[in-house]
């Protein structure tokens, strides 16, 4: 078996990494899904494509986070396909960074490069779009990002960043989700596929049979629900700034408390706080140069 890639279904190949890259060979089109990071993909993808005799191909981006698209410049694709809610973020790194992180300082901390794509190269697709005849169909998995897309194959489902493996969850503590409530709904959708016997292809995690996919879905759902409970517990007891709150939660989850985990985790926690405003009141106070939040029962 090639060390460059692994066949997981007829015409579907995984190039290992975090995130993984998929190469899909259809009768009428070839696809590279999520080129990944440039540092470990430039030569690897070219070698895999050559080994698989793939000369012409399109690129499909599950979403536009930098770790999934940075290696675009190493490829010579015909077109780049993306969902409508990810379109502007693909064209503009400024929009991408504001939508993803809320500001731009985090880019230097994470070592993110600014990549802009010309609109003439881009095609907009939506849920139900078929990659080819019996070759996979797009599935809306929004939550991690506004327009995250998965792919349903004959016996497997590509879940992108909607489901994370144990190692990543252990490392980051708080999984990044633009909309935590929507992410939970998406997990329920994926669980239904697992219960039908579909295997799971995770961007950041191992290939999973249906039973293991169901376990991963439950693990991710339980983590989001636990974080919600911790947000309520802390903010009903004392006022905290967003970063103070995230730091406390990371400590309780036994994850590393570093700048990246705090800043990325803040997006998820802020989303949870916004949802809680349907059930709780929110008060603010300023002390020590920080805006601190407190939840009060209505």
What role is predicted for each listed range?
Residues 2-50, 149-165:
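Conserved beta-strand hairpin/beta-sheet module of binuclear metal-dependent hydrolase folds
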Residues 11, 24, 34, 63, ...:
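Divalent metal-coordination and catalytic microenvironments
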Residues 14-15, 25, 47-55, 71-77, ...:
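Alpha-helix C-terminal capping segments
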Residues 30, 59, 79, 156-157, ...:
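Hydrophobic "anchor" residues on beta-strands that sit immediately upstream
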Residues 37-131:
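Active-site HxH/HxHxD metal-binding segment of metal-dependent hydrolases
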Residues 37-39, 137-142, 146-216, 222:
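Metallo-beta-lactamase
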Residues 211-238, 291:
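Short alpha-helical segments that sit at the start of domains
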Residues 230-298:
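C-terminal regulatory/interaction regions
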């Amino acid at each position: 078996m090639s060390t460059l890639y692994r066949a997981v279904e007829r015409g579907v190949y995984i190039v290992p990494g975090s995130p993984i890259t998929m190469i899909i060979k259809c009768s009428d089109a070839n696809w590279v899904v999520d080129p990944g990071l440039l540092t470990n993909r430039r030569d690897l993808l070219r070698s895999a494509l050559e080994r698989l005799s793939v000369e012409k191909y399109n690129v499909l981006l599950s979403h536009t986070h930098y770790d999934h698209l940075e290696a675009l410049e190493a490829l010579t694709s015909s077109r780049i396909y993306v969902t409508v809610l990810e379109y502007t973020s693909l064209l503009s790194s400024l929009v991408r960074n504001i939508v993803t992180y809320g500001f731009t300082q985090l880019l230097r901390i994470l070592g993110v490069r600014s990549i802009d794509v010309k609109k003439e190269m881009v095609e907009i697709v939506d849920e139900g779009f078929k990659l080819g005849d019996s070759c996979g169909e797009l599935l809306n998995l929004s939550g991690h990002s506004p327009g995250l897309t998965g792919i349903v194959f004959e016996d497997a489902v590509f879940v992108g960043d909607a489901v994370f493996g144990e190692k990543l969850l252990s490392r980051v503590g708080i999984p990044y989700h633009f909309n935590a409530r929507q992410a939970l709904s998406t997990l329920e959708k994926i669980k239904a596929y697992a219960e039908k016997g579909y295997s799971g292809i995770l961007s950041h995690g191992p290939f999973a049979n249906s039973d293991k996919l169901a376990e991963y879905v439950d693990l991710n759902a339980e983590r989001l629900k636990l974080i919600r409970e911790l947000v309520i517990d802390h903010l009903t007891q004392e006022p905290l700034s967003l970063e103070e709150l995230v730091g406390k939660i990371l400590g309780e989850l036994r994850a590393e408390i570093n700048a990246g985990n705090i800043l990325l985790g803040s997006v998820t926690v802020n989303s949870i706080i916004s949802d809680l405003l349907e059930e709780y009141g929110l008060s603010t106070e300023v002390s020590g140069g920080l805006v601190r939040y407190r939840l009060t029962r209505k």
